[in-house]
Amino acid sequence: MSQLSLFSAEARPAALTDLAGLLCGPGQIVRFGAGDQARLSIVLADATRAPAVRSACAEAGVGAQAVVTESGTTALRTAFRCDLAELARAWTRGAVKMVPQEWQLDGPTLRLWALTAGAPDGRGGYLLGLDPHAPQTHQALVAATTRVGLPPARIGDALRISGTRRVARLVELVGPPPARLPAGAWPRYRGRAAC
């Protein structure tokens, strides 16, 4: 039996702050009115992930609705909510998405990032997608993944986690694959998914 990491996704119950994982990838958060409400949205590259992402949002206490965009892709969005305003304040400067200073990545947040924007690279590594429309977040996310023990290589609009120890650490942090996730999409270590 392996020891549970204090930073893994299974170390604590889901929390609203875990939704920052959507913002590590292509997610967006916008404030409304006086800034006391915010809406979180994300366009998914893979529509089959929508049920798993909706379930993860619900575990964090936030409902998300699936919609089809004008371009035909699937997006998830929340209602405007007061409890998302603090996340919006932390992750934006004006209308620009920014990673909070000294922000610490953890397992639950990394799990949502992998769920929404992660993919195996076909060579034993794993890619964590970045927001191509927010290049100002990329270097801070490189630093955050490095601080959590996953120093990545930047490959275009993604961070590549590779190497036996790093992939094992990633598998440890994200925990087992969500029930509704398509097969083969979750990080694996030597052919084994997290268990």
Predicted regions: what is each one?
Residues M1-C195:
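Internal intein/HINT superfamily modules and their associated LAGLIDADG
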